[in-house]
Curated annotation (Swiss-Prot):
The active site is at 372 (cysteine persulfide intermediate). This is Probable cysteine desulfurase. Its cofactor is pyridoxal 5'-phosphate. Pfam families: Aminotran_5 (PF00266). The gene is csd. It comes from the Archaea. Keywords: Pyridoxal phosphate, Transferase. The lineage of its organism: Archaea, Methanobacteriati, Methanobacteriota, Stenosarchaea group, Halobacteria. It comes from Halobacterium salinarum (strain ATCC 700922 / JCM 11081 / NRC-1) (Halobacterium halobium). The modification N6-(pyridoxal phosphate)lysine is found at residue 233. GO terms for biological process: cysteine metabolic process. Its EC number is 2.8.1.7. SUPFAM superfamilies: PLP-dependent transferases. Belongs to the class-V pyridoxal-phosphate-dependent aminotransferase family. Csd subfamily. It catalyses: (sulfur carrier)-H + L-cysteine = (sulfur carrier)-SH + L-alanine.
Amino acid sequence: MEATEQGPIDVEAVRADFPILEREVAGGEDLVYLDNAATSHTPEPVVDAIADYYRRYNSNVHRGLHELSQEASVAYEDAHDKLAAFVGGEDREEMVFTKNTTEAENLVAFAWGLNELGPGDEVVLTQMEHHASLVTWQQVADETGAEVKYIPITDDGHLDMDAAADMITDDTALVNAVHISNTLGTVNPVGELADIAHDHGAYIFVDGAQAAPTRAVDVQEIDADFYAFSGHKMLGPTGIGCLYGKRHLLAEMEPFLYGGDMIERVSYEDATWNDPPWKFEAGTPVIAQGIALAEAVDYLQDIGMDAIRAHEEALTEYAYDQLTMTDDVDVYGPPGDDRGAVVSFNVDGIHAHDLSSILNDYGVAIRAGDHCTQPLHDTLGVPASARASFYLYNTRDEVDALVAAVDEARQIFAP
């Protein structure tokens, strides 16, 4: 299973840790799972970590002096340390566990945005943002009188950085940018955006849902004020996301939810708050999920994030080349050697939903629709697209199966 940091991945050994990949679907077809941008699969060591928690030391955290509670509390706190270090943070005080990236976005928008924004302030997003960013900041803007602006994309799917430099001004309070587009695969220069934002006294929130699972991330090198990602896209369980925040910002922010464990002292008149990250984790937290996500980080780091990135880049470039050479196929976004592990496309005369249904008949699982980026699809001039996305356990043979199934669909719909 393991590889050196720069060495190739032993894909067959990796696949052995994922029994689901041995499934047959659609009446006997081998499963070709290419929907990793939506969710990844979970390896046996991570499943074992969840089972071990429930079998051996299931208990609430920060609430008991008995041995089980102490064991669970230590494991849960250590998971914060591990996830903080995974993205280049310094310690657990900078790592809040949420239920997903969307909740992390909402936490910042409502704990920081509602208290800090007002008329005359601007929040600058990109045209390729996920609905979790778009809708959230639109709602905060409606409540505060702030204005939301959007950095346009170029014809080849990159961010227009000249426009970004013009749009980010002293009126900008926050820049929200996706690190890797879940539709175009564009890898955005978030470090450059952070520099521009900070030059104008603004903060930057980076949506790392597609980046953190697939490449080494260093929030200090980026100089991100906030960086969010989800466990289920990086071999972890569902129900857990992560929000990195600079320590001083989290310390200054008001809580997002209220209840147990996020308090320091409560009286009948008022309350004071616990320190970060606990003041943002009200109630019984995501204990099993946090412990399992730490195990997923171990799994990824044993293989090596550089090795994972190299494997995905090779697969993505191959898929891009094969699809662009296929008649009647339009591929969106940057060239194949300049993108994350996502390829969105359409086949002339076939709606993306119909294409996905036909591909399923051949065992190929992709996503079809707007991928929670309706405004971006409006910009592209299409109502929907098909999306193939790759991860560490995918192979060139699976890309070939995708392309062959697309060609079969073309034949079915041929006039």
